[in-house]
Amino acid sequence: MKNTIRRGLCLLLLLAMTAAMAACGQKNTNTGTDEKTMVYAVEAGSAGEEVAKEKGWTVNSVQDQAAALMEVASGTSDAAIIDLLMAGAMIGEGTSYPDLTYTDRLTEEEYGIGCRKGSDLAQYINCVLGDAYQSGTMQKLAQQYGITEELLVPQQEGTFTAGEDSDVSYIQQKGTLVVGITEFAPMDYKDENGQWIGFDADLAKLVAERLGVEIQFVVIDWGQKINELDSKAIDVVWNGMTLTDGVMSAMACTNAYCKNA
């Protein structure tokens, strides 16, 4: 993992109710409200939760970012902190939450993919993503899911060398790549047939295909993602995961593949 990957290149957004929702008996728009008296819905274990706590804000930690939006829409929280990519897919005109809008950009981040500490799967995924980027497949998937190409981090072709205690071999022997996710459009979400799709989901399918195994998506408690990896309940965390210092010290992470700024 390159040392140049730092905490920072995707944006977190502060979402607040618009006046239209306030007129329906919901909480007010928070204009002029002291941010420290507000309640912020955040995904448990996320970079958004970390930022809010660093600022001394009152947080309502929920299962995932979709749940954070629901908290704001129902009036049980004043605002939510979510990723820009999800905000683009989920709020505003023509979306599930047309009366929500974003007000502030808090931090910048980069996304990476997490594997068990010491796992050679991260290197394997780097190679697959390198091929996908160089062939234009990654760019086509980004366009399909409404992600602008400038948000992609260029990937280079590489070679894979299996580790001594190879996680890749373990996954191939058991015949299934188990991917830990939360529902997070446009990265991982279900289509009308109940099948998992999205930018991350489709990239994970490419890795499973290259491995020659089936793929299984498992919804996890985001705050327990490291335990899920270490217990081998899942093989990889692939869900718009921010490359924080804590994540990179606890997991074998891929190179950054997407920005959110």
Predicted regions and their residues:
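Sec-dependent N-terminal signal peptides
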Residues: 8-17
